[in-house]
Structures are given as structure tokens and as C-alpha cells.
């Protein structure tokens, strides 16, 4: 066993600790929606920005979380974007992540992924709604464990809804629609989002909303 595996279990700086000393903002940073590979220049820029004043944390959402002074957020975002880094939007909106399409070997779904990102990400919803796109049937980035899971295969998508991503009741989403043609997937997702906006309770997470209402007639009408 490596001597460093458990040598430093409690970090010196966390987002919570930093906010006891001043006002900090957390930025979710990655090389992009599909690309998962950082460059040395990007890591150098991250280290330069954070220095001794902030904090860096790995997350399970394929991004690095940077805690930076709130007064420096605008400048920080500009510097990160100049080296090709992507900063995810925060808040109660539709968000998206994707697999790496086998590091670019299976790019069939890349074009529709970009279209869906441009059309859907940022739409306001009752609680943050996570769409996870996987580019082949292997689904090795666990699309079925997000609010809306999309698994691409042969010009179509299987759509999974209502996963409980964590906790003792964690479970995969249910197969809601099978082999939805690429040309209809945006329309279906827009309809699902509209249902969530229209019929959810205040601050109700998508998985609770879906399991509470999945017997409602409007769900069946979406896939007829």
C-alpha cells in the first residue's frame, strides 16, 4: 500500500473553510463536454490562479472545482477560457455532461450532443436537471444514473428517466423511451423539461417529480 494513500485525509482548505475567511465562489472547470484531457498549460494556469489563496477539488462530474475569491471571478473565468477551459453554468438550470466518445474513436453522436447542449443547457427548471449523454451502448459513463440518461446506438437514443444518483436508495433510471430517432430527440427532451417545469412542486428534484407523476397520462402522450 502506498504510504500516501491515507497520509493526509483532511484537506487544509475547503470551500466551507475558505468562506469563513472571506467570500469565495466555486467554479466547475473542465476541458469541455466531451474532451476529458487537460493540457500542461491548463494545469499551470489553474495552479497560477489558485496559488495559496484558493482550493482545488476533484469532482465526480468530470470537472475540477476551483474555489476562488468572488471579487476575482470575472477575471478568473476569462483567464481560464483563454487556455481553452470550459466553465459550467451553475444554478437551477438544465445541465449536461457526456462521455468521452472513446477518446474520439466513436464520434457519431458528437454533432447531436453539441446541438442539444446549445438548445437545452441553461433553461431554468425547479431544481438542477442533469442530462448525461453516452455515445454508445456500453454506457461506460453511467448515463442511466443521472436525471435524464441518453444512450446512443445506431442513429437513435434510449432515454432513461428518474435515477436516484446517491444515498441508500440509489438506483438507475427507468427506460422511458427506446430507439428515439436522432431527429426527434431534442423535441422529446424539450417536452420532458416542459412537463417538469409545469407539474413539479417547489424545489422538487427531478427523480422525485418523475416517480410521483410517472403514471400521469401526459408521460404516455410524449412517446406515442
Name each model-derived stretch.
Residues 52, 203, 207-224:
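Membrane-embedded hairpin module used as a gating/binding unit in multi-pass transport
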Residues 1-45:
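N-terminal basic/disordered segments at the start of proteins
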Residues 80-83, 192, 213:
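Alpha-helix boundary/capping residues
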Residues 42, 72, 112, 185-188, ...:
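Alpha-helical structural motif
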Amino acid at each position: 500500500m502506498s504510504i500516501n494513500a491515507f497520509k493526509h485525509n483532511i484537506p487544509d482548505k475547503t470551500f466551507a473553510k475558505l468562506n469563513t475567511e472571506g467570500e469565495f465562489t466555486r467554479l466547475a472547470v473542465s476541458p469541455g463536454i466531451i474532451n476529458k484531457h487537460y493540457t500542461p498549460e491548463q494545469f499551470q494556469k489553474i495552479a497560477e490562479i489558485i496559488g495559496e489563496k484558493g482550493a482545488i477539488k476533484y469532482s465526480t462530474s468530470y470537472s475540477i472545482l476551483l474555489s476562488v475569491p468572488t471579487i476575482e471571478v470575472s477575471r478568473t473565468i476569462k483567464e481560464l477560457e483563454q487556455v481553452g477551459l470550459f466553465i459550467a453554468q451553475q444554478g437551477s438550470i438544465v445541465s449536461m455532461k457526456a462521455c468521452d466518445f472513446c477518446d474520439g474513436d466513436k464520434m457519431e453522436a458528437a454533432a447531436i450532443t453539441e446541438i442539444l447542449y446549445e438548445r437545452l443547457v441553461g433553461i431554468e427548471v425547479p431544481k438542477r436537471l442533469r442530462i448525461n449523454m453516452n455515445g454508445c451502448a456500453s454506457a461506460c459513463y453511467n448515463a442511466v444514473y443521472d436525471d435524464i440518461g441518453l444512450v446512443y446506438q445506431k442513429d437513435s437514443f434510449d432515454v432513461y428517466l428518474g435515477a436516484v444518483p446517491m444515498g441508500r436508495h440509489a438506483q438507475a433510471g427507468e427506460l422511458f423511451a427506446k430507439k428515439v430517432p436522432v431527429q426527434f430527440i431534442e423535441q422529446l427532451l424539450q417536452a420532458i423539461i416542459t412537463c417538469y417545469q409545469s407539474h413539479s412542486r417547489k424545489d422538487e428534484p427531478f427523480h422525485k417529480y418523475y416517480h410521483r407523476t410517472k403514471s400521469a397520462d401526459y408521460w404516455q402522450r410524449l412517446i406515442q
